[in-house]
């Protein structure tokens, strides 16, 4: 059994590493810490363009339909770079809508989560 990553996942890892190094350096993150939102919306839009927000969302709703292990590659590399972006929260929110939402809710919200137009977070009380 092979427990390593696939070639595609390794290419994704390289893409995330490059993004964190070139677009979201530690110096940039330090700057973002002083902003009210805590992150740069233009970088969020770039993440969306790269498809990271759509990884686990069904293609029917604008996603890529990949597995959670693919998302894990993104989360691992962004965490190494101290990413301030709510990528996991976004993925968990979309998974909740996908598993519990009505068809109308899925059609309304999942495309907006996939393209980064909307940011959601989960809270447990």
Report each predicted region and the residues it spans.
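A non-catalytic, amphipathic alpha-helix used as a structural packing/dimerization or gating element
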Residues: 11-18
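Short, flexible segments with low predicted structural confidence
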Residues: 1, 18-19
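Intrinsic disorder at enzyme termini
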Residues: 1-8
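Glycine-rich flavin
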Residues: 21-123
